[in-house]
Amino acid sequence: MARIPRHRRLVLPLLCLLFQGATSLLFAIFVRYNHETDAALWHWGNHSNVDNEFYFRYPSFQDVHVMVFVGFGFLMVFLQRYGFSSVGFTFLVATFTLQWATLLQGFLHSFHGGHIHIGVESLINADFCAGAVLISFGAVLGKTGPAQLLLMALLEAVLFSVNEFILLSLLGVRDAGGSMTIHTFGAYFGLFLSRVLYRSQLEKSRHRQTSVYNSDLFAMIGTIFLWVFWPSFNSAPTALGDGQHRTVVNTYYSLTASTLSTFALSALVSGDGRLDMVHIQNAALAGGVVVGTASEMMLTPFGALAAGFLAGTVSTLGYKFFTPILESRFKLQDTCGVHNLHGMPGLLGAILGVLVAALATHEAYGDGLQTVFPLIAKGQRSATSQAMYQLFGMFVTLVFASVGGSLGGLLLKLPFLDSPPDSQCFEDQVYWEVPGEQEAETQRPLRTEEPDTQA
């Protein structure tokens, strides 16, 4: 077993301590409770406790939080020798991202009086940023070390926050469930990152890039958690009342349709009529991605079913046919197939948002037009103009993701980082003490580290 040299093994603890120290200092200087969290401010206004936003937002936050740490973490444990890293590095990267995103989004959205003011909505938005980072992590799963992932999160959270601010605040784009800002951005950031980190000798570890019965079973736990809580994910930032209610309903039915289409297509493309667990674990979730943008709009229940069915179909076909083409022709080594689960369904969701926005009328929304499309309600935009802004937002996201992912790949190629050698990718023992294997390891001579072939 090749080991990471001692000087490179110090990078992770140094980065953890440096990042925690820096964020702690910034929190001390800038971060304060908002008026619904601060004891003096809340009670000075003589508010009733039942009116506090905590009681409306915390249930959704709790579900989103579970999705980030349990759903994403366990979805990636399908690799037979990489379970510790899948869950553990998800834990590490997400916790750092939550702190960093709170600062970044705070400066952009809630900075006044010289301070960032935070509450439960800040927690939800930070979780969304962590979700995008973990999507990118899926593209390079098994081929990067924890220090590399921390640097990836450092850069990606900045670009995510700026892209989100441009779309939502400057362009007036509607993207409640993040088809563009979370899924499309995270997927294509990760794909371009993977392209820059391409390994020509990855075949040396290909025997580890497979699953076994138990690893697939644990990954299915992640799928079920994500599937069950996805309506909360899409509805968490939406306006209270009918908007949040409608978002849950649309997401719910879209997920059911994507699941049925995934089972159907998986059996059809297998050749012998048997199901592929990779398809079920991933493509069944595409319905939640595809309605992210349009979930708060008047999509209609039939529209949600149709969108989910299309997303499940496209995602399943992507896993079967498109992923091998991406690697062989475009040198994109997408470990988790994020292009199929998040990338293509995210683009479909953005286009769906364009179409539904173009059909927005006061007759369809009534006074609810003010909460879903405030610029149309105020007469500052037509429905067609809003649709064009939605489309432009998709292209802005792709630019940020592609340029950012490429820059991130160059950053992660720095020689002092903890990249695993080609022959030890998808292997927990490079970074973790694995029970039952330490004694056997000490009885074998350790090989010197092999150079990797990231080019």
From Swiss-Prot:
<dbReference type="GO" id="GO:0016020">
    <property type="term" value="C:membrane"/>
</dbReference>
<feature type="topological domain" description="Cytoplasmic">
    <location>
        <begin position="318"/>
        <end position="340"/>
    </location>
</feature>
<dbReference type="GO" id="GO:0035379">
    <property type="term" value="F:carbon dioxide transmembrane transporter activity"/>
</dbReference>
<feature type="transmembrane region" description="Helical">
    <location>
        <begin position="391"/>
        <end position="411"/>
    </location>
</feature>
<dbReference type="InterPro" id="IPR002229">
    <property type="entry name" value="RhesusRHD"/>
</dbReference>
<dbReference type="Pfam" id="PF00909">
    <property type="entry name" value="Ammonium_transp"/>
</dbReference>
<dbReference type="GO" id="GO:0030506">
    <property type="term" value="F:ankyrin binding"/>
</dbReference>
<feature type="transmembrane region" description="Helical">
    <location>
        <begin position="11"/>
        <end position="31"/>
    </location>
</feature>
<feature type="topological domain" description="Cytoplasmic">
    <location>
        <begin position="271"/>
        <end position="274"/>
    </location>
</feature>
<dbReference type="InterPro" id="IPR029020">
    <property type="entry name" value="Ammonium/urea_transptr"/>
</dbReference>
<comment type="similarity">
    <text>Belongs to the ammonium transporter (TC 2.A.49) family. Rh subfamily.</text>
</comment>
<feature type="topological domain" description="Cytoplasmic">
    <location>
        <begin position="143"/>
        <end position="148"/>
    </location>
</feature>
<feature type="topological domain" description="Extracellular">
    <location>
        <begin position="238"/>
        <end position="247"/>
    </location>
</feature>
<dbReference type="GO" id="GO:0030659">
    <property type="term" value="C:cytoplasmic vesicle membrane"/>
</dbReference>
<feature type="region of interest" description="Interaction with ANK3">
    <location>
        <begin position="413"/>
        <end position="421"/>
    </location>
</feature>
<comment type="function">
    <text>Ammonium transporter involved in the maintenance of acid-base homeostasis. Transports ammonium and its related derivative methylammonium across the basolateral plasma membrane of epithelial cells likely contributing to renal transepithelial ammonia transport and ammonia metabolism. May transport either NH4(+) or NH3 ammonia species predominantly mediating an electrogenic NH4(+) transport. May act as a CO2 channel providing for renal acid secretion.</text>
</comment>
<dbReference type="GO" id="GO:0008519">
    <property type="term" value="F:ammonium channel activity"/>
</dbReference>
<dbReference type="GO" id="GO:0016323">
    <property type="term" value="C:basolateral plasma membrane"/>
</dbReference>
<keyword id="KW-0924">Ammonia transport</keyword>
<feature type="transmembrane region" description="Helical">
    <location>
        <begin position="84"/>
        <end position="104"/>
    </location>
</feature>
<comment type="subunit">
    <text>Interacts (via C-terminus) with ANK2 and ANK3; required for targeting to the basolateral membrane.</text>
</comment>
<feature type="topological domain" description="Extracellular">
    <location>
        <begin position="105"/>
        <end position="121"/>
    </location>
</feature>
<feature type="transmembrane region" description="Helical">
    <location>
        <begin position="122"/>
        <end position="142"/>
    </location>
</feature>
<dbReference type="GO" id="GO:0072488">
    <property type="term" value="P:ammonium transmembrane transport"/>
</dbReference>
<dbReference type="InterPro" id="IPR024041">
    <property type="entry name" value="NH4_transpt_AmtB-like_dom"/>
</dbReference>
<feature type="transmembrane region" description="Helical">
    <location>
        <begin position="275"/>
        <end position="295"/>
    </location>
</feature>
<keyword id="KW-0325">Glycoprotein</keyword>
<feature type="transmembrane region" description="Helical">
    <location>
        <begin position="177"/>
        <end position="197"/>
    </location>
</feature>
<feature type="topological domain" description="Cytoplasmic">
    <location>
        <begin position="198"/>
        <end position="216"/>
    </location>
</feature>
<feature type="transmembrane region" description="Helical">
    <location>
        <begin position="341"/>
        <end position="361"/>
    </location>
</feature>
<keyword id="KW-1133">Transmembrane helix</keyword>
<dbReference type="GO" id="GO:0097272">
    <property type="term" value="P:ammonium homeostasis"/>
</dbReference>
<feature type="topological domain" description="Cytoplasmic">
    <location>
        <begin position="412"/>
        <end position="455"/>
    </location>
</feature>
<dbReference type="GO" id="GO:0005886">
    <property type="term" value="C:plasma membrane"/>
</dbReference>
<protein>
    <recommendedName>
        <fullName>Ammonium transporter Rh type B</fullName>
    </recommendedName>
</protein>
<feature type="glycosylation site" description="N-linked (GlcNAc...) asparagine">
    <location>
        <position position="46"/>
    </location>
</feature>
<keyword id="KW-0812">Transmembrane</keyword>
<dbReference type="GO" id="GO:0070634">
    <property type="term" value="P:transepithelial ammonium transport"/>
</dbReference>
<feature type="topological domain" description="Extracellular">
    <location>
        <begin position="170"/>
        <end position="176"/>
    </location>
</feature>
<feature type="topological domain" description="Extracellular">
    <location>
        <position position="296"/>
    </location>
</feature>
<feature type="transmembrane region" description="Helical">
    <location>
        <begin position="149"/>
        <end position="169"/>
    </location>
</feature>
<keyword id="KW-0968">Cytoplasmic vesicle</keyword>
